[in-house]
Amino acid sequence: MGEVVLRLEGITKNFGALKANENVSLNLEKGEVLALLGENGAGKTTLMNILFGQYTADAGRVEVFGKTLPPGMASAALDAGVGMVHQHFTLAHNLSVLENVILGTGSLWSWKVRYKQARQQLLELANRYHLKVNPDAKVSSLSVGERQRVEIL
């Protein structure tokens, strides 16, 4: 058995009378790839929103690298290294790629960070993951594929 890097334990989430998730538990070990499969409305997106701290579970807990994340705090998830590529784009169309990345990772990059440093970090990440992006391009001018790359970054 390898090192558990992500643990969801007993996750339950209700929306009124609707049970979106009921006692969901899973472990992800270092080096594993995990896919959630299910029909529309099965609760996959709800579970991911709980992992990322956008929703608060009614019961259960989320651990990343052995540390329990406080419920409903996306900033804590980001600080722990959890990222989220949203099902629907969440980019600000009137901002540049660089401005969107800075905005989306506020807990990681302070707005006080000089653009030059932020640009360098963005380009290093893009290069590391082979994602071609233009930091100065307005999101409104990007193709769907380019917007997806920005979401990943």
Positions of PLM-derived features:
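Glycine-rich phosphate-binding loops of nucleotide-dependent enzymes
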Residues: M1-L153
